[in-house]
Structures are given as C-alpha cells and as structure tokens.
Amino acid sequence: MELRYLRYFVAVARERHFTRAAKALGISQPPLSQQIKRLEEEVGTPLFRRLTRGVELTEAGEAFYEDACKILALSDAALEKARGIARGLNGNLSIGITSSDAFHPKIFALIRQFQVQNMAVQVHQVEANMSSLTAMLAEGELD
C-alpha cells in the first residue's frame, strides 16, 4: 500500500466528495476514483458509501480513516525529523523559565512552535527563580 493511496483516501474522507477532494489534491477526479477503488480492493471491503451528492465512510472506512491519519502523521513527523537532522537541528535544548513566565501564553506558543518545526530536538524546560537560572546558565546546564 502506498502512502499516496492513504493521502487520497483521507482527502476524500474529509471532503466527503470526490470532485472536491480531487481539486484539493490537484488531480482530476477519474484517477482519484480509480485509486480509491484500488485501495478498497486491496483492503477487501468498501471504505465509502457512494451517495447521490458525495460519499460517506462505511464502518470499515471509519476505522481505516483513524489509522490512516495516524500513519500519515507519523510519516510526516519522520520526514521532518530526518530533515531537521540533516540541517543539524537535533539533540537537546535546555531552556530556563521563571515560575512567573512558565505559563505565559506567548512563551508556551513559541516553545510549541519550535517543537513542531524542529521535531528532532528534545526541548527540556527548567522552572526556577532568576538567580538559579543565571547560575545554571553559567554552569552550562542551560542553553
């Protein structure tokens, strides 16, 4: 089974319509329908119920959708991790945060954004008072 089939399946499941999914994927509708048909043959059961105005997932399609989304997310994460390592963005990052700033929305958002963009980097947060953080920085315990 190719990842491409999973991407096509997820697009149709989200759009609930072959033509809209094809447009979102940048392909024409007939090849998309053919790929979904091949996927259903490979799985051995229909994944969609064809309706007059779109499609809906079958029970098997619902279960397959959940796993397909997980597989695609893992595939994307693996790709980003490898790219990060190739750019030298891997390892650990230790940052210090004062207790008063630990839950500040902007700081939390920045850390989360960094983690998403640099999946190969493990971020460790140390919460302490300013004098302790300064000492830890001087000792090389924080980046």
UniProtKB/Swiss-Prot annotation:
Residues 18-37 bind DNA. InterPro entries: Tscrpt_reg_HTH_LysR, WH-like_DNA-bd_sf, WH_DNA-bd_sf. SUPFAM superfamilies: Winged helix' DNA-binding domain (SSF46785). It holds the Pfam family HTH_1. GO terms for cellular component: protein-DNA complex. Keywords: DNA-binding, Transcription, Transcription regulation. Residues 1-58 form the HTH lysR-type domain. The keyword Membrane does not apply. One of its GO terms (molecular function) is DNA-binding transcription factor activity. Regulator of the budABC operon for 2,3-butanediol synthesis. Belongs to the LysR transcriptional regulatory family. This is HTH-type transcriptional regulator BudR. It comes from Klebsiella aerogenes. The gene is budR.
